[in-house]
Amino acid sequence: MKYNREEFEEVIVNIGRVTKVVKGGRKFRFTALVVVGNRKGLVGYGFGKSKEVPDAIKKAVDDAFKNIIDVKLNGSTIAHDIEVKYNASKILLKPASEGTGVIAGGSVRPVLELVGIKDILTKSLGSNNSSNVVRATIKALSMLKN
């Protein structure tokens, strides 16, 4: 499905540098994890790799637009509690009353803010690997029922 890219915001969650040691020295490559969302229920994440940081970010954004999901919101929060595990990362999402704000840490916050959720309580358990935490959060949001 084609989306109007001007409506979406991008947040770079993580940029990593990978080193390969070869006979002639070290070769660096970069990875980028990007989350895109329109604050109206659509969100996606993407992963890009390249020899240069801007190229890795561009690839990650393109990948994010291929992985967009539609999240069912209940006003400014979610409809029910949900707990999801992705690899060693575990995410707990709880609906919150209006005015609470987004209480989330690390890589969970950009995903929830770009979806358009304004009031939610979260807890990240287990591994805090940003890639797995983002994937667990997206998985949890896709499993929500209204």
UniProtKB/Swiss-Prot annotation:
Cited function: With S4 and S12 plays an important role in translational accuracy. Located at the back of the 30S subunit body where it stabilizes the conformation of the head with respect to the body.
GO cellular component: small ribosomal subunit
Domain-level remarks: The N-terminal domain interacts with the head of the 30S subunit; the C-terminal domain interacts with the body and contacts protein S4. The interaction surface between S4 and S5 is involved in control of translational fidelity.
Gene that this polypeptide is encoded by: rpsE
Keywords annotated in UniProt: Ribonucleoprotein, Ribosomal protein, RNA-binding, rRNA-binding
Domain S5 DRBM: 8-71
Pfam families named in the record: Ribosomal_S5, Ribosomal_S5_C
The protein, known as: Small ribosomal subunit protein uS5
Gene Ontology molecular functions: rRNA binding; structural constituent of ribosome
Superkingdom to which the source organism belongs: Bacteria
Example of a GO biological process term: translation
Family label: Belongs to the universal ribosomal protein uS5 family.
Subunit structure: Part of the 30S ribosomal subunit. Contacts proteins S4 and S8.
Keyword 4Fe-4S assigned: no
Parts of the chain that traverse the membrane: none
